[in-house]
Regions:
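Eukaryotic helix-grip
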Residues: 22-214
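Bacterial N-terminal signal peptides
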Residues: 7-15
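Sec/Tat signal peptide C-region and signal peptidase I cleavage site
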Residues: 17-21
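Positively charged n-region of N-terminal signal peptides that target proteins for export
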Residues: 1-6
């Protein structure tokens, strides 16, 4: 009887193991100390995770991420970026346009950004969530309907930090999910390579943010 019970549970076991395998993070790209992972989640578009260590303080990183107008200098294929509304020193709404490869239409993103910090661990969280209905869409751009981006930044020393980055996105438009997933790790990798250079600029290295403890 015991073997029969075990036999009955085999399909359940393999189903559970298969689900876990599908949800496991898979390393897709590694370059210059940057690791980019992806996994299949509940949505049709892959989730993305990035990991890197950067020679920068929390303040340097926060200053760069709050400097929305400069996103065009490092964020992959961003062609325009500006603040829509500054709510406080650590919170704002912003707008960006993103160039995509032909024949796909270019995208635009409307988003809310908020920075928080754990008072005990000092880990800084930068959370950006799309707000697609905040302003009217334009007919020549596809409005990204959903984007959820999180930076978890942990201080390692007075001059070095570890970044763990998470992204879930639905880019909108008619492109099939399999095609989007095929190239989903390229944008974060290219962005982080430029980010490592951008964050070393004097205006970030010399910055002071009162609500961040390094």
């Amino acid at each position: 009887m015991n073997w029969f019970k075990q036999f009955l549970f085999l399909p359940l076991f393999f189903s559970f193991a298969s689900a876990r395998a599908q949800n496991a993070w898979v390393l897709k790209e590694e370059e210059n100390g940057i690791k980019i992972y992806s996994r299949h989640g509940a949505a049709k578009f892959d989730e993305i995770r990035g990991e890197l260590v950067v020679k920068a303080r929390l303040t340097d990183i926060a200053s760069l991420l709050l400097d929305v107008n400069e996103y065009t200098q490092w964020s992959y294929n961003v062609t325009r970026a500006y603040i829509l509304k500054q709510l406080s020193a650590d919170e704002l709404y912003f707008y960006t346009t993103v160039k995509t490869a032909w024949p796909a239409s270019d995208r635009d993103v409307v988003a809310h950004l908020k920075i928080t910090q754990d008072s005990i661990t000092k880990m800084m969280t930068v959370h950006t969530i799309s707000e697609p209905n905040l302003i009217p869409a334009t007919k020549d751009l596809v409005r990204v309907p959903f984007s959820d981006e999180t930076w978890k930044v942990t201080p390692l020393s007075a001059t070095e930090s570890r970044i763990t980055y998470y992204l879930q996105i639905d880019p909108g438009g008619a492109a099939p999910a399999w095609l989007i997933n095929l190239f989903s790790t390229k944008a974060p990798m290219e962005s982080f390579k430029k980010f490592l250079i951008q964050v070393q600029k004097p205006k970030y290295k010399q910055s002071f943010i009162g609500f961040i403890r390094n």
